[in-house]
A protein has these predicted regions:
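Structural detector for internal amphipathic alpha-helices that build alpha-solenoid repeat scaffolds
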Residues: 1-3, 10, 18-33, 42, ...
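Short inter-helical turns and helix N-cap capping residues of alpha-solenoid HEAT/ARM repeat scaffolds
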Residues: 15-16, 48-49, 78-79, 110-111, ...
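Short, contiguous alpha-helical
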Residues: 39
Length: 189
C-alpha cells in the first residue's frame, strides 16, 4: 500500500479493480501529472470495470483541457456511472462546448444521478443556453433534480430566476424547499 501512495501510476495497471481505483485516487491526491493523466485517461476509455472507468472520467475533471477529447469520447459509454462522471468533469472544467450534451442529459429520461450531475455541471458552467431547461427542471423533475436545479439557477442573472426560486421555496419536497429557502428565504404558505 505504501508503494501505491508513493508512486501510484504503475498500479493503474493492477489486475484488481479496487487497486486501480485506489491508484486513481492517489494520482488525484498527489496532483495529476502528464504521466498519470495518460494512465487515467486510458482507464477511462478502456477499463473493463465500469466503476473504474467512471472514477477515471471524474478524475479527468482535474486534468484541464488536455482531458476534453477523452471526456468527449466517453459520452458513448454504455455505463450511466460514466455519463455521470463525465458530466461532473465537464462542470469542474467549466467546459462550455459540452453544454448542449449536458442540456440533453439533464432534460432526458436517463438515470437520476446522471441528470443531477448534468444539472450541477450546467450551473457550474453558467451558460445562458441552459437557463430554459433549468427553469423547466426546477418546476417539473424528480426531487433530487429539482434541488440541483435550484442551486444551478443561482448563477444566472435573469428576471425568470427569482420567481422560479420563490416557487421552489414552496415545493412539496422538503429538500427542494430547503435548498430554495437558503437562497431566497422562507416563503409564506
Amino acid at each position: 500500500m505504501v508503494r501505491l501512495l508513493d508512486d501510484p501510476v504503475p498500479f493503474l495497471d493492477h489486475p484488481d479493480a479496487e487497486v486501480r481505483r485506489l491508484a486513481i485516487s492517489a494520482c488525484v491526491a498527489s496532483g495529476l501529472t502528464d504521466e498519470s493523466v495518460a494512465g487515467v485517461a486510458r482507464l477511462a476509455g478502456e477499463d473493463v470495470d465500469g466503476a473504474v472507468r467512471a472514477m477515471a472520467a471524474e478524475a479527468l475533471g482535474g486534468a484541464g483541457q488536455r482531458a476534453v477529447a477523452v471526456l468527449d469520447a466517453l459520452r458513448s459509454d454504455d455505463d450511466p456511472r460514466v455519463h455521470e462522471a463525465v458530466a461532473t468533469a465537464y462542470g469542474e472544467l467549466k467546459h462550455g462546448e459540452a453544454v448542449p450534451w449536458l442540456i440533453e442529459m439533464a432534460a432526458g429520461d436517463g438515470d437520476r444521478a446522471s441528470r443531477e450531475a448534468a444539472v450541477a455541471a450546467l450551473g457550474a458552467i453558467g451558460d445562458g443556453a441552459a437557463l430554459p431547461v433549468l427553469l423547466d427542471l426546477v418546476a417539473d423533475a424528480p426531487p433530487q433534480v429539482r434541488r440541483r436545479a435550484v442551486v444551478a439557477l443561482t448563477v444566472f442573472d435573469d428576471s425568470a430566476v427569482e420567481p422560479a426560486l420563490r416557487n421552489a421555496a414552496r415545493d412539496r419536497n422538503p429538500s427542494v424547499r430547503e435548498a430554495a429557502e437558503m437562497v431566497v428565504g422562507r416563503q409564506p404558505d
